[in-house]
Amino acid sequence: MKTIEGNLQLKGNEKIAIIASRFNHLITDRLVEGAKDAFLRNGGKEENIELILVPGAFELPFGLKRAIKTGKYDGIVCVGAVIRGATPHFDYVAAEATKGIANTTLQADIPVTFGLLTTDTIEQAIERAGTKAGNKGFEAMLGLIEMINLYKEL
């Protein structure tokens, strides 16, 4: 049986976008830095990264759709943080952002990865943005690198 899988080594010419929500920027800034770090550590070049900022998580799918349409990128990472509050707003934003990103990704002809945190507390978000639980932006970029390379093999 032949196995086809991606690897974590970039050639250096791959162009990527990081689409980040500005809302909860203390968290999302760390996710962006984690994604950038993973890209650079695995052979990417800083000049091949574009950061696209959208107001909040709900706007991530639209930003993703427009970025895909440009045809400029080999892959895209979406990052953001939705933190539960006292109202049902969290449930709507988290569900619709997730669904929008998933639906847009399935229509894309480039790899897209998901680094949107949906947490119950600010502490959980902080943990997932570079402290106890690693950095989910870094992890999302590793997934993107692997998928970019897998895409080339398929």
Swiss-Prot record:
Pathway: Cofactor biosynthesis; riboflavin biosynthesis; riboflavin from 2-hydroxy-3-oxobutyl phosphate and 5-amino-6-(D-ribitylamino)uracil: step 1/2
Residues the record lists as binding 5-amino-6-(D-ribitylamino)uracil: 23, 57-59, 81-83, 114
Keyword set includes Transferase: yes
Molecular function GO labels: 6,7-dimethyl-8-ribityllumazine synthase activity
Catalytic activity: (2S)-2-hydroxy-3-oxobutyl phosphate + 5-amino-6-(D-ribitylamino)uracil = 6,7-dimethyl-8-(1-D-ribityl)lumazine + phosphate + 2 H2O + H(+)
EC code(s) of this entry: 2.5.1.78
Residues that hold (2S)-2-hydroxy-3-oxobutyl phosphate according to the record: 86-87, 128
GO cellular component: cytosol; riboflavin synthase complex
InterPro entries: LS, LS/RS, LS/RS_sf
Keyword Transferase: yes
GO biological process assignments: riboflavin biosynthetic process
Active site: 89
Database matches in Pfam families: DMRL_synthase
Record key words, sorted: Riboflavin biosynthesis, Transferase
Superkingdom of source: Bacteria
Annotated function: Catalyzes the formation of 6,7-dimethyl-8-ribityllumazine by condensation of 5-amino-6-(D-ribitylamino)uracil with 3,4-dihydroxy-2-butanone 4-phosphate. This is the penultimate step in the biosynthesis of riboflavin.
Family matches, as PANTHER family: 6,7-DIMETHYL-8-RIBITYLLUMAZINE SYNTHASE, 6,7-DIMETHYL-8-RIBITYLLUMAZINE SYNTHASE DMRL SYNTHASE LUMAZINE SYNTHASE
Stated family: Belongs to the DMRL synthase family.
Protein name: 6,7-dimethyl-8-ribityllumazine synthase
Species the sequence originates in: Nautilia profundicola (strain ATCC BAA-1463 / DSM 18972 / AmH)
Gene: ribH
